[in-house]
């Protein structure tokens, strides 16, 4: 080993490390370590005082021994003494030893804290940096108690050097993450926000990380950071600016800072219009740069550019308010779906899953369905295939449900075992949600059991039985299908359960066919009996006693089975008891009693799909971010508006015209009695005392209301405390709205009371009912409220939702307009050109037509215009108008009292950037209101 002088290094340490490495056995290593420990102990206890170099060397040896896994029970005081040295290397080793070996319960903690305080007060940037690093590395609650009040002062002090500011910001971030309750908010918060304008890259990057974390828990304190972050981001991404151009990384200016600024902006709702315009320009610039040819072939360039791009797309999705940006983001991600880099394909699929939840970009996402299906078949990485499954699930609607379900079933046969159960749940949900033909639903679930029976949970096969029982029109087909499926030589046990239950209820519907006579049905089921587990055998015994009631001709055969020793003397108590009771019942009961006891199962009253609940449980606990998941659960096809679902022919089925496939409950009939008291189910209470305390509409409420005219799902309102999300569906004159109240803070909301305020005339035209919500909303959680809606007659105004609650001892009062508008009760109507103009001429009275000529408020994009007309509820009639640039629509407004036909014509003038909208309906008030609503969309 080359000689190392005393001034350049520690020769003794180097020799010791070399000796340890040269040890041939564990015993030799321990012997050498014990020898060194004895030497160090003697040096520390010797009469001769050690100089700083020797202390440093011996402390380093102790540190090395500790890192080898051996206990160290001395040397701590010597390390603490090094903290008071004025030599950098000695102080550095002292802090290193303290950070690694000293715990918060040490008797030396007071001495250590004093040394750290001295260094923080020294104004020596090197010593201050070492002290801050030590505090951050230890990061204990005791450290937070001692220094959480001092570090913010260092951070915002005008004479603090940039390197120390950077360390102080990161140190404070570490303490806040471990002990947020010990970091006081004060005057420094407003000053730390201005660090976003600092010219030192390290300072502004560290400050952005700190502000982002603080803003998530204290949004009101840091809301001024939004405009500063947008301004700084604009200066970075705009090529004309010279801000931080010295920090360009492979032709990408300050990529890490750009990502952090974009992430900070996701902590807040869309900013006010002035700032929003500048932010939109930034996002457009980032999307434009993504389309430019790469300036370097090196991977660092593409990584930096794509990091900024994906964070920008996340912000676009979070705001969900700019249709053009959403569609552009979708198109950009679509290009990445076939990129040679696996990580980019994964990230593109993941981001598109969220984009599919937006009304504006759902159609754009659907255009990539073939690429996603191909990824499902060809990707070698299982995580990418799983994201492809998630995206197919998110983009599914009635127009592509059968194709997507078929592809998922095909993939399920070869899918990785770790994700099979989740795929099974998703297939079951999609098949149920979009089943217009219930024979297809039955076939799909049985195929699901055949392919992945081990992963089909009880919730799935319970659900298919519930739906078959609730629908007369599919019972015969289900019985025939399960009978045929059971004839396979090898059947999964779940198929035996489904088959046994359905044949026990509806086997009589196929008994007329000689190929499925009662005896054949019984023999088929009994051939599987001895291969099944105890719970399945118990179910089959119940099927047998049902057969006794349905088919008297097989009664004797079944009694012989029940009477056999294998049943009456079965080791399992449940099977034995069933055999004894069923045998006795079949022997002593008269035909009438038997028919009464064993009558057909009544329809299942259900409020929530257990399959959907199970999928959510697999995805994690409910939080505010579940609003994004809620958006994905699309129950209405955005491509074609609400579609009719065949009503059940069962006499006991629910009266709702919407076949509630997800079991979310039918719309109840209008109440005939007086409304319940304030603790009851009605949310509408216009005479309540709280009406006098209703707050004015929240800022931006009108804009958010207008956005929901052509969409049914999304975030209606968001501030620093509360997020309100909506998901709604409408069928003819009935509707149902799910409201999600999300607590964005870590503190409980108390006395949480939502109230719906309706004007007198609106209350007579619109019937609204709901159940009360829990008055306590935990931090980071959400509660759901369901409003059942019935349109009695046409209306103009919208109800106002007022939310009152207590947060941190202060009273909060928020009011927003609830987007229940007349067009929600639109039923699209297809008609030929001749029929359209014939009907147009019939509605020629002046009071039946309303026309509006107005300036375009948004870019005049054909596809977005089509999507908005369809989202408005009207059918979009192609090739009807002689001018192909015009848009023509037709539909019927359904109310309880009448149906109102509606025709519309939208004529764009691209040169003048103007529109002319003409509406003709059989009722003048309807024409006027629909014209007002639709005009605001363009």
UniProtKB/Swiss-Prot annotation:
GO annotation, cellular component aspect: AP-2 adaptor complex; cytoplasmic vesicle; membrane coat; plasma membrane; synapse; synaptic vesicle
Main location: membrane
Role this protein plays: Component of the adaptor protein complex 2 (AP-2). Adaptor protein complexes function in protein transport via transport vesicles in different membrane traffic pathways. Adaptor protein complexes are vesicle coat components and appear to be involved in cargo selection and vesicle formation. AP-2 is involved in clathrin-dependent endocytosis in which cargo proteins are incorporated into vesicles surrounded by clathrin (clathrin-coated vesicles, CCVs) which are destined for fusion with the early endosome.
GO MF annotations, alphabetized: clathrin adaptor activity; disordered domain specific binding; kinase binding; phosphatidylinositol binding; protein domain specific binding; protein kinase binding; protein serine/threonine kinase binding; protein-containing complex binding
Protein's GO biological process: clathrin-dependent endocytosis; intracellular protein transport; synaptic vesicle endocytosis
Biased composition range(s): Pro residues: 668-677
Location(s) in or outside the cell: Cell membrane; Membrane, Coated pit
Tissue spec: Widely expressed.
Protein's name according to its UniProt entry: AP-2 complex subunit alpha-2
């Amino acid at each position: 080993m080359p000689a190392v002088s005393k001034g350049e290094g520690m020769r003794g340490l180097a020799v010791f490390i070399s000796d340890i490495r040269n040890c041939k056995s564990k015993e030799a290593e321990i012997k050498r370590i014990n020898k060194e420990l004895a030497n160090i102990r003697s040096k520390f206890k010797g009469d001769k005082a050690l100089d700083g170099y020797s202390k440093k060397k011996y402390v380093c040896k102790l540190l090395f021994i500790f890192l080898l896994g051996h206990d160290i029970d001395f040397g701590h005081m010597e390390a603490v003494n090094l903290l008071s040295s004025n030599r950098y290397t000695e102080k550095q080793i002292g802090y290193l030893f303290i950070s690694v070996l000293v715990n918060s319960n040490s008797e030396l903690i007071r001495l250590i804290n004093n040394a750290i305080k001295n260094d923080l007060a020294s104004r020596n940037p090197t010593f201050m940096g070492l002290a801050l690093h030590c505090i951050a590395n230890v990061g204990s609650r005791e450290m937070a108690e001692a220094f959480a009040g001092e570090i913010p002062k260092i951070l915002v002090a005008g004479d603090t050097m940039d390197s120390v500011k950077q360390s102080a910001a990161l140190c404070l971030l570490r303490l806040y993450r471990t002990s947020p309750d010990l970091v006081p908010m004060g005057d420094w918060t407003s000053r730390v926000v201005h660090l976003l304008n600092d010219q030192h890259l390290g300072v502004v990057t560290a400050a952005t990380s700190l502000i982002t974390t603080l803003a998530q828990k204290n949004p009101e304190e840091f809301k001024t950071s939004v405009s500063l972050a947008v301004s700084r981001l604009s200066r970075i991404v705009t090529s004309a600016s010279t801000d931080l151009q010295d920090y360009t990384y492979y032709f990408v200016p300050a990529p890490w800072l750009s990502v952090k600024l974009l992430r900070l902006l996701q902590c807040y709702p869309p900013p006010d219009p002035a700032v929003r315009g500048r932010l939109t320009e930034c996002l457009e610039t980032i999307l434009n740069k993504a389309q430019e040819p790469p300036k370097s072939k090196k991977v660092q360039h593409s990584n930096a550019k794509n990091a900024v791009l994906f964070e920008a797309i996340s912000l676009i999705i979070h705001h969900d308010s700019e249709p053009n940006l959403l569609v552009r983001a979708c198109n950009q991600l679509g290009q990445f779906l076939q990129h040679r880099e696996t990580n980019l394909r994964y990230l593109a699929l993941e981001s598109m899953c969220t984009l599919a939840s937006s009304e504006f970009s759902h159609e754009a996402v659907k255009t990539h369905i073939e690429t996603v299906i191909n990824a499902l078949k060809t990707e070698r990485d299982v995580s990418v295939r799983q994201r492809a499954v998630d995206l197919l699930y998110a983009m599914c609607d009635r127009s592509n449900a059968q194709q997507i379900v078929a592809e998922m079933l095909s993939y399920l046969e070869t899918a990785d075992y770790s994700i099979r159960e989740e795929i099974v749940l998703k297939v079951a949900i999609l098949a149920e949600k979009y089943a217009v033909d219930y024979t297809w639903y039955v076939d799909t679930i049985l195929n699901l059991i055949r392919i992945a029976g081990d992963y089909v949970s009880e919730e799935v096969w319970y659900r298919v039985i519930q739906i078959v029982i609730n629908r007369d029109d599919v019972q015969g087909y289900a019985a025939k299908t399960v009978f045929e499926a059971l004839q396979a030589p090898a059947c999964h046990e779940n198929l035996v359960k489904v088959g046994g239950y359905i044949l026990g209820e509806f086997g009589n519907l196929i008994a007329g066919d000689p190929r499925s006579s009662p005896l054949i049905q019984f023999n088929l089921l009994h051939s599987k009996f001895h291969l099944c587990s105890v719970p399945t055998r118990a179910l089959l015994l119940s099927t047998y006693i049902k057969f006794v009631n349905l088919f008297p001709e097989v009664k004797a055969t079944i009694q012989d089975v029940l009477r056999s020793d294998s049943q009456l003397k079965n080791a399992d108590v449940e099977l034995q008891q069933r055999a004894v009771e069923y045998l006795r019942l079949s022997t002593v009961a008269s035909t009438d009693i038997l028919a009464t006891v064993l009558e057909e199962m009544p329809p299942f009253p259900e409020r929530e799909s257990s399959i959907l609940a199970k999928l959510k449980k697999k995805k994690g606990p409910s939080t505010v971010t579940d609003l994004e998941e809620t958006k994905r659960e699309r129950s209405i096809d955005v491509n074609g508006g609400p579609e009719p679902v065949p009503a059940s022919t069962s006499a006991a089925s629910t009266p709702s015209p919407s076949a509630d496939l997800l079991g979310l409950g039918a719309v109840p009939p209008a109440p005939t009695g007086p409304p319940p008291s304030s603790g009851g189910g009605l949310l509408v209470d216009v005479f309540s005392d709280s009406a006098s305390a209703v707050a004015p509409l929240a800022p931006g409420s009108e804009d958010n209301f207008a956005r929901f005219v052509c969409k049914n799902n999304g975030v209606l309102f968001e501030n620093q405390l509360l997020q309100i999300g909506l998901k709604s569906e409408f069928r003819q004159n009935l509707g149902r709205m799910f409201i999600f109240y999300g607590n964005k803070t870590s503190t409980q909301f108390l006395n949480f009371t939502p109230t719906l305020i309706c004007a007198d005339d609106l209350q007579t035209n619109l019937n609204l009912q709901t159940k009360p919500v829990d008055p306590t909303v935990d931090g980071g959680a959400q509660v759901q409220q369901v409003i059942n809606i019935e349109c009695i007659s046409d209306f103009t105004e919208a109800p106002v939702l007022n939310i009152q609650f207590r947060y941190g001892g202060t009273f909060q009062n928020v009011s927003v307009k609830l987007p229940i508008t007349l067009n929600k009760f639109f039923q699209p109507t297809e008609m030929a050109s001749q029929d359209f103009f014939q009907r147009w001429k019939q509605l020629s009275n002046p009071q039946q037509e309303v026309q509006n000529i107005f300036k375009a408020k948004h870019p005049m994009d054909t596809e977005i215009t089509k999507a908005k007309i369809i989202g408005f509820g009207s059918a979009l009639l192609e090739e009807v108008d002689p001018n192909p640039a015009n848009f023509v629509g037709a539909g019927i407004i359904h109310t309880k009292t009448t149906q109102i036909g509606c025709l519309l014509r939208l004529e764009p003038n691209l040169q003048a950037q103007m529109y002319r909208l003409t509406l003709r309906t059989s009722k003048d008030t309807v024409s006027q209101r629909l014209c007002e609503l639709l005009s605001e969309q363009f």
